[in-house]
Amino acid sequence: MKVRKQTLWRVPAYCLIASCLSFYVTVYLGDAFFMVRTIDESGLLTTNLNIVRYVLFNSALFLIVLLLGGLCAFRSMTRVEIAVSAGIMTVVYLIVLGIQLSLPQFPTAIFIIAIFQTWPGILSHLLALVTGPHILLAVTCFLAPLLFTPFGRKQVQ
């Protein structure tokens, strides 16, 4: 099991870029897709979330990121290299989660961290809709980078 050192940065870089792009896609395109705005009799604008569209949008976004990463970005990597690289990103996510949970009033100045947690966070949102909110969802969603592992090659060519 030899891991090429130049491949260790690929999954963390891809996850951070994909999370940032997912954040902006959700904010700008998602608003037009799953937010329903109506004007009631009194002339007030009410905004509601269409939950079916929300689930479809987030599921599609998660799968697009997963498939683009697995089929394009990590094509030349072995399964072991992807697992090690994804493990690095998972450890970073779990450290940040530990800091967030240990500080009762997590500083709002560090809100920028949320942008880089968007892609794995989609998984926890979808699981929370099915199972209900639970603290374990915060931990399991950060294992999402490990889902790239089956897309790797069995050995280096």
Which positions does each model-derived feature cover?
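Canonical alpha-helical transmembrane segments
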Residues: 50-79
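Transmembrane alpha-helical insertion/packing segments
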Residues: 1-58
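Hydrophobic alpha-helical transmembrane segments
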Residues: 12-13, 52-62, 83-87, 123-145
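Membrane-interfacial helical/loop segments at transmembrane boundaries in membrane proteins
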Residues: 38-42, 107-128
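Hydrophobic alpha-helical membrane-insertion segments
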Residues: 14-27, 84-106
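Membrane-interface helix-boundary motifs at transmembrane edges
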Residues: 2-7, 70-84, 154-157
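Membrane-cytosol interface at the C-terminal ends of transmembrane alpha helices
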Residues: 64-74, 92-99, 144-148, 152
